[in-house]
């Protein structure tokens, strides 16, 4: 039998070999091999005979065939996919290569329905690819649910420490799904340096100065004539199809629904799975004791019809309780031709619960408000040092909320830590939560000015 020694775990002295479904324990069998060698052995539990090694040749590796084009039946989205296809194809080939070579891979995905649906699709694709090679899932693929919206130095330091355990035939691989397109990620990327290769799948608007834009495998629909409605989860599903040609339609639906995409297809399964993903990524303790959750664990939950029904019932109860509490505590501002609503999340969610998360509840509440109001709406929901903003597209066309937040950051550099997001869904992080009422008033003033009226809105309780 012939195996490529792809990497060696320094701490525990495991050798990971291509086409071998198990690890060779170096301490047990006195194997003195190094990454990049091809070894020929009849029994991997015995020492490697002399003269059985040779250098790895690139030609020995067969990558999965990738056929084009991949379509989902949504004309605009399919056109964007077509424009992104060379980048998607290259990223899929790179991911397949690293996994088949057993190179260490870290996959970070955002903790919401969009990020987790993309992670589940990729998990299924990699599992199918490995099974087609009659191999087990590699133990050196690490899945991390990323709670923040950026990739900071603390995350990078943890990743670099894990990667440092390995001597590899090639550079390890980092994959980011649905987060990180921010200048706040620059330090994390710089910290990693050239120690890894990176595949970055995102759909957030690209901030000026964001260094990830220049990476070879950074893929974002904004660079190809698209926008945030082409979600990161959808992008990950398309890439996953390229790897293993699986049906990812339900995860596509869950992603599009979860991120309020205009491409959303409201299938029953899509709505149910989007709700479940949203809940268990908001509060992993609902399904386990750890604050982390992996795609494999998500799949075990989704496979149980009884568990799915229990979680959906719980989600409906918690959402309605939160909605009722929010309705009682809303403040309303009358703007010129529009309405603004302010919600204090402390008055919404019960103590000790994590679902719904503030940002996701802001979207739920805004949908309810905009459906009941004839005038365009803006909602600002505040929680701790954060302000989550949702806005009607008609209002945004007049106001330009992303540029308004950029102006607000320039005006209050000493107060605002960070801010940004999509056109209609943004957030601001403050250095001190005591400043949030001042920032909310200032945003209302700027919105009013941009609507062509130079007066502050009149605050009143609903």
Q: What does each model-identified segment do?
A:
Residues 13, 44-53:
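Short, Lys/Arg- and Gly-enriched loop/turn segments at beta-strand edges
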Residues 1-11, 38-41:
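Structural detector for short beta-strands of small beta-barrel domains
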Residues 341-462:
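Glycine-rich, acidic loop segments that terminate in or are immediately followed by a histidine
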Residues 111-114, 125-201, 206-210:
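N-terminal small/polar loop signature for handling phosphorylated ligands or for N-terminal nucleophile
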Residues 100-107, 111-113, 208-352, 363-372, ...:
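A structured phosphate/pyrophosphate-recognition subdomain
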Residues 18-33:
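Beta-strand/loop nucleic-acid-binding surfaces
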Residues 35, 53-108, 115-116, 124, ...:
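An N-terminal, well-structured beta->alpha segment
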């Amino acid at each position: 039998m012939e195996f490529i020694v792809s990497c060696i775990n320094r701490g525990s002295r495991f050798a990971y070999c291509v086409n071998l479904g198990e690890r060779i324990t170096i301490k047990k069998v006195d194997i003195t091999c190094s990454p990049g060698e091809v070894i020929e052995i009849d029994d991997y539990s015995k020492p490697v005979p002399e003269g059985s090694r040779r250098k790895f040749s690139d030609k020995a590796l067969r990558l999965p065939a990738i056929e084009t084009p991949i379509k989902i039946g949504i004309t605009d989205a399919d056109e964007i996919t077509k424009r992104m296809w060379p980048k998607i194809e290259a990223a899929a080939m790179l991911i397949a290569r690293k996994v088949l070579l057993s190179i260490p891979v870290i996959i970070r995905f955002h903790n919401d329905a969009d990020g987790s649906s993309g992670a589940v699709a990729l998990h299924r694709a990699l599992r199918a690819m490995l099974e087609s090679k009659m191999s087990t899932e590699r133990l050196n693929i690490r899945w991390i649910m990323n709670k923040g919206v950026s990739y900071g130095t603390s995350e990078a330091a943890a990743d670099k420490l894990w990667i440092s355990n390995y001597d590899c035939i090639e550079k390890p691989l980092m994959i980011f799904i649905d987060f990180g397109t921010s200048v706040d990620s620059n330090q994390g990327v710089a910290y990693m340096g050239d120690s890894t290769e990176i595949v970055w799948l995102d759909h957030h608007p690209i901030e000026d100065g964001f260094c990830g834009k220049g990476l070879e495998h950074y893929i974002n629909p904004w660079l190809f004539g698209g926008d945030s409605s082409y979600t990161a989860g959808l992008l990950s599903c398309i890439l996953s199809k390229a790897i293993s040609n699986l049906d990812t339609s339900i995860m596509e639906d869950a992603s599009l629904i979860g991120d309020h995409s205009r491409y959303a297809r409201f299938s029953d399964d899509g709505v149910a799975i989007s709700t479940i993903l949203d809940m268990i990524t908001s509060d992993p303790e609902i399904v386990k004791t750890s604050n982390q959750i992996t795609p494999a664990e998500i799949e075990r939950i989704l496979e149980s019809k009884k568990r799915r029904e229990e979680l959906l019932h719980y989600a409906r109860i918690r959402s309605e309780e939160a909605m009722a509490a929010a309705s009682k505590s809303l403040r309303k501002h009358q703007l010129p031709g529009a309405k603004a609503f302010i919600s204090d999340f402390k008055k919404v969610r019960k103590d000790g619960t994590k679902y719904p998360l503030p940002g996701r509840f802001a979207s739920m509440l805004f949908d309810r408000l905009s459906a009941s109001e004839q005038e365009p709406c803006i909602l600002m929901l505040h929680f701790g040092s954060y302000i989550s903003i949702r806005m009607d597209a008609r209002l945004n066309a007049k106001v330009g909320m992303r540029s308004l937040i950029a102006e607000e950051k320039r005006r209050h550099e000493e107060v605002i830590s960070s801010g940004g997001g999509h056109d209609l869904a943004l957030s601001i992080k403050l250095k001190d939560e005591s400043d949030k009422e001042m920032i909310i008033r200032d945003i209302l003033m700027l919105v009013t000015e941009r609507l062509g009226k130079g007066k502050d809105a009149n605050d009143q309780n609903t």
